[in-house]
């Protein structure tokens, strides 16, 4: 019988918090030293993109992975299956770069949707290619979509994305609605000096389309390393602006303890809408983090802001078996810090920009 050590109670508490039966004979539960159980996986399938948002990647001369350096669909399927079937991962989100620029992306969705035990399969996209792919993605098994939309104005879109195309994004959102996804959320970065004039229009748009809108505090993930804390339009500032425009903004909590967004309801022209505020900078939610990230070249990251990665691609290609891969995954989880530390004096942004990590 296991002795009643502190680690015993941590694992009991973690299992209860995660909503799973406690199984003390299971050595593979991905619980870190702070009791956080990791059941959510972000998989980046490319570091390439068809726009150049300043908060994500450089405008010119971006260095991309060679094709041989990117995980194959079969390698992604192997790791995803291992994490779901043997490590308790329950949801997977496909990211990039822009995932839809990778050829035959729909085939990968179909492969992942067949994994026994996977409860949720979603994607984050810039929406530019959704008109061409939304129906096929839905029929392949993709359940939910997050679409980046920082503005409805073309001039502002070009300022952010350094490419034209907001009309294509809006058309892609319409295509996603037509395809019948279980959930569609719009993600808007909250950037001081830019977003203040966009908030109200985006809220009206989201209510008109009957989708959820989330404002995400601007984070230090830009390739130019130009981020400063003064550039963050805080969640509190967003709520103040929305209250001035719409009146009561009523908090409704989080979808679940590990959800990054605090949700609110408000009314516009007699219709109710739902918004989310993700305070990654001013009110971090690291204590409830349940996420792991897999980069396009097979690096496993235990935090978006981690300074290190566990290289799983090379391990697989050198013949590493599943048990050894799990050991590497467990070690990565075990090294996770308590928090990202953006507010600390010694904080350093990750070496990779957002497009190379995966959104």
Curated annotation (Swiss-Prot):
PANTHER family, per the entry: MOLYBDENUM COFACTOR BIOSYNTHESIS PROTEIN 1 (PTHR22960:SF0), MOLYBDOPTERIN COFACTOR SYNTHESIS PROTEIN A (PTHR22960)
Keyword Acetylation: no
Protein name: GTP 3',8-cyclase
Keywords: 4Fe-4S, GTP-binding, Iron, Iron-sulfur, Lyase, Metal-binding, Molybdenum cofactor biosynthesis, Nucleotide-binding, S-adenosyl-L-methionine
A GO MF label: GTP 3',8'-cyclase activity
Binding site for GTP: 42, 93, 124, 185, 291-293
Free-text function comment from the UniProt entry: Catalyzes the cyclization of GTP to (8S)-3',8-cyclo-7,8-dihydroguanosine 5'-triphosphate.
Source organism of the structure: Rhodopirellula baltica (strain DSM 10527 / NCIMB 13988 / SH1)
Enzyme superclass (EC): lyase
Cofactor(s) the protein needs: [4Fe-4S] cluster
Binding residues annotated for [4Fe-4S] cluster 2, in chain numbering: 286, 289, 303
NCBIfam families: moaA
Reaction(s) this enzyme catalyzes, per UniProt: GTP + AH2 + S-adenosyl-L-methionine = (8S)-3',8-cyclo-7,8-dihydroguanosine 5'-triphosphate + 5'-deoxyadenosine + L-methionine + A + H(+)
Binding site for S-adenosyl-L-methionine: 55, 97, 148, 219
């Amino acid at each position: 019988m296991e002795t009643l050590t502190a680690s015993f109670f941590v694992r009991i508490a973690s299992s209860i918090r995660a909503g799973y039966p406690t199984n003390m004979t299971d050595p593979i539960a991905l619980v870190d030293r702070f009791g956080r159980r990791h059941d959510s996986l972000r998989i980046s399938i490319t570091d390439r993109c068809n726009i150049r948002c300043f908060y994500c990647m450089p405008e010119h001369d971006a260095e991309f992975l060679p094709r041989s350096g990117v995980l194959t669909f079969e390698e992604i399927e192997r790791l995803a299956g291992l994490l779901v079937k043997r490590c308790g991962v329950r949801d997977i989100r496909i990211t990039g770069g822009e995932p839809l620029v990778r050829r035959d992306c729909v085939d990968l969705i179909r492969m992942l949707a067949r994994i026994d035990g996977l409860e949720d399969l979603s994607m984050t996209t810039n929406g530019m290619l959704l008109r061409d792919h939304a129906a096929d993605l839905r029929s392949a098994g993709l359940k939910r979509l997050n679409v980046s939309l920082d503005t409805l104005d073309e001039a502002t879109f070009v300022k952010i994305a350094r490419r034209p195309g907001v009309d294509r994004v809006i058309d892609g959102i319409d295509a996603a609605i037509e395809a019948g996804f279980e959930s569609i959320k719009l993600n808007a970065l909250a950037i001081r000096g830019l977003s203040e004039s966009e908030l109200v229009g985006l809220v009206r748009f989201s209510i008109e389309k009957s989708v959820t809108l989330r404002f995400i505090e601007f984070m230090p993930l830009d390739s130019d390393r130009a981020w400063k804390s003064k550039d963050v339009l805080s969640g509190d500032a967003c709520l103040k602006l929305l209250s001035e425009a719409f009146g009561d903004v009523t908090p409704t909590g989080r979808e679940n303890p590990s959800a990054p967004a605090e949700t609110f309801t408000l009314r516009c022209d007699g219709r109710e809408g739902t918004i989310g505020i993700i305070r990654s900078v001013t009110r971090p939610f690291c204590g409830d983090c349940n996420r792991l990230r897999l980069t396009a070249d097979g690096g496993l990251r235990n935090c978006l802001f981690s300074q290190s990665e566990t290289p799983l691609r090379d391990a697989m290609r050198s013949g590493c078996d599943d048990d050894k891969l799990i050991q590497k995954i467990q070690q990565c989880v075990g090294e996770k810090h308590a928090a990202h530390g953006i507010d600390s004096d010694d904080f350093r942004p990750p070496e990779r920009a957002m497009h190379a990590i995966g959104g």
